[in-house]
Amino acid sequence: MKNSLLNYIISFVAVLISVSLGILTGIDEVRNGIILSFIIHWLLFIPAYVFKTEKFYDLTGTISYISIVLYVLLSSTDGIINFGNMIVSSLIIMWTIRLGTFLFTRIKKAGEDKRFREIKKSFSWFFMAFTISGMWVSICAICALTGISNGIELTGVTYIGIVIFIIGFALEIISSTLLDKSIVCSSAILSFSSA
C-alpha cells in the first residue's frame, strides 16, 4: 500500500511538472500536446496492464511523440505550414520512428524487457512507468513543440542544427547496429552514443 501511494504521488508530480512546463510556454497547443502525450500513454497502459505485457511500451512513446508533433504542427499554423516547421517535424518523426522501431525489435527478439518483470505485476508501478514515459516525451519534445508552434524560420542556425542532427542520427544508427551485433562501443566517438 505504501509503495502504491508513492507510485501515484510520483505519477502526479510527473504530470504536474510536465503540464506546468507546457503552461509556462504560454502556448495552448504546446500545453495541449503535453496533455495528449499523457492521454496516449494512459490509454495504451490499459491493454498493457490487462495483458501484463511491456512489449509495446516503447511503441507507446513513439506513437505519443509522433502524435504530439503532428498535433502542434497542424493546430498552430492555421493551415499554413512553413518549410522550417516541416523540416523540424520530419526530423523528429524520422528519429522517433527509428528509435521506436529499434527498441520494439530489440524487445521482440529478446522476448521481454527484463526491467518490467516485476513492474508489470503492480498496477501502480506499471502506471507510474507509463506516466514517466509520458513525462519523458513531453520534456524532450517541449522545445521543438514551442519552436514549431511559433514557426521555425530557416536561418544559418537552423541549417547548423540540421547538420548536427544528421551527424548525431548517423552515429546513433551506427551505434545501434553495432550494439545489435553485440559489439561494444567503448572507444572513440561511438562511446558517447546512448543506443
Which positions does each model-derived feature cover?
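Membrane-anchoring alpha-helices and their flanking helix-loop junctions
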Residues: M1-S193
